[in-house]
């Protein structure tokens, strides 16, 4: 029979192995996000990313796939461009309810517009499927097509949860161009 310490060592080794190989095509263990910015590149699949603290932004690109499965996700992206971003074939899915403040203040003098939730490029997708989403856009540069949701270059944004509340100041709610699509199929 194994001693208690030996049993604990075996269990910890098994747990570590499970974490290392969790998911599909994973080259690194799933990464818990607790603060700041999360950036996913390459072909890694991180599923799930669970966290309880506020995130400044999530940017997914180059075919990476990120699934956020926490019960509630809070994103405070004020004064950061493209707080939730999928580009170059990246896919971001938020399964839990999303409470996000996104966008940048007035940048018209610089000729630069910043939207909040952005999908750019063919195969790039953002899917919000939480039951109660609340999006507040702080963008104020209406003339540069700033919006709470912005899809372009064949990017896709799909909102499929039960209820989504969007508040804007001077920006658009949605903007899509160059073959992109934004769909709201929630109740």
Please give the residue ranges for each predicted region:
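Short hydrophobic transmembrane-like helices used for membrane targeting/insertion
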Residues: 26, 126-127, 173, 182
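Glycine-rich repeat segments that build the extracellular carbohydrate-interaction surface of secreted
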Residues: 32, 38-49, 60, 67-69
